[in-house]
Curated annotation (Swiss-Prot):
InterPro entries: Cyt_c-like_dom, Cyt_c-like_dom_sf, Cyt_c_ID. Cytochrome c2 is found mainly in purple, non-sulfur, photosynthetic bacteria where it functions as the electron donor to the oxidized bacteriochlorophyll in the photophosphorylation pathway. However, it may also have a role in the respiratory chain and is found in some non-photosynthetic bacteria. It comes from Rhodocyclus tenuis (Rhodospirillum tenue). One of its GO terms (biological process) is photosynthesis. GO terms for molecular function: electron transfer activity; heme binding; iron ion binding. Binds 1 heme c group covalently per subunit. Belongs to the cytochrome c family. Keywords: Electron transport, Heme, Iron, Metal-binding, Photosynthesis, Transport. The keyword Glycoprotein does not apply. The lineage of its organism: Bacteria, Pseudomonadati, Pseudomonadota, Betaproteobacteria, Rhodocyclales. It comes from the Bacteria. This is Cytochrome c2.
């Protein structure tokens, strides 16, 4: 399955890019931040579905909320696994 196409269809790429900050954090930042963390996948699936804010305010220079997304749990899980598999990028 092509998760980048799913990310495009679901509107994720309006605010995210694998390699650079757009409105939200680069997916490579997310991959680095959560690498090896127990429970990271479930935490991020919940965040993709319900929305969230506050994690990346320092790096983004503002408190930018991510809205709840119109995805199923299965779609959110596919997207999160894809994001976590991407090349990790420093977010200093």
């Amino acid at each position: 399955a092509d998760e980048s196409a799913l990310a495009q269809t679901k509107g994720c790429l309006a605010c995210h890019n694998p390699e650079k900050k757009v409105v939200g954090p680069a997916y490579g930042w997310v991959a680095k931040k959560y690498a090896g963390q127990a429970g990271a996948e479930a935490k991020l699936v919940a965040k993709v579905m319900a929305g969230g804010q506050g994690v990346w305010a320092k790096q983004l220079g503002a408190e930018i909320p991510m809205p709840a997304n119109n995805v199923t749990k299965e779609e959110a899980t596919r997207l999160v696994k894809w994001v976590l598999s991407l090349k990790q990028i420093d977010y200093k």
